[in-house]
Amino acid sequence: DYGHQVVSVMLSCNGITLNYAVILYDKSRSKIQIVQEIAEELPAAPVISYFLCDSWYTTAKVMDRFIRKGFYTVGALKTNRILYPCGIRQKASAFALHLRKTDPDVSLVTVGSREFYVYRYEGELNGIPNAAVILSYPKDGFGNPKALRVFLSTNAELSTQEILDTYTKRWPIELFFRQSKSKLALDSYQIRSRQGIQRYWLIMSLVHYLCCMHSGNYCTFEEGYASLKQQLKQEQFANLYRLIKSSASFEEAFKFVG
């Protein structure tokens, strides 16, 4: 088998979410270094902005690089991340074992259509002087270590609800990969050269952009893809009609269709 690892970044502003970069991870530099370099490329945020990520990228180095550009971080944390509740060093997973539904600091919140029990910790993490950390369990999975999820915000002024709602906005990057695999052959192309791979990803990103912006107004990728597909089909039939109308031979028409 032969595969490639990808680091992808999406930018979102005023309801418009587009692919910003698709970068080949070839182990010549770490994923952390790649994301740090992307942060350096970004212009300073003109308003309060957020870097949304999974637990791979919630490291002090990455978050520091983004905060310098005016981006707070809202991301997932690994459950073995060290916290300091009451000044006592503990893994988040170990601390969560002591939580009870009846604790005054444990509350039930709704995110989307689901309910979660949450506990909020504010304070120090290794390499981070102050952040808000949310320990959460699904309503029906409270106390189950495998169900524990941990989230972080370097903007401690956000409420627990705001942190969780903000984190859900990173879903478009998951959709981008799913759509690129199902519609743009991300998981089935057969290219080995680095240059060829990068060229393909560039074309793929361009097609994704065209699908989202083809009408001059932003729409979902699925809507744009369906519309462009229909437009291409109409153009093909129109060209075939003109060819037949010009008294083209059967062989010429067959060659055009085939």
Regions found by a protein language model. Name each.
Residues 7-11:
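Short beta-strand scaffold segments in enzyme catalytic cores
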Residues 12-258:
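Single, function-defining residue in the core of a domain
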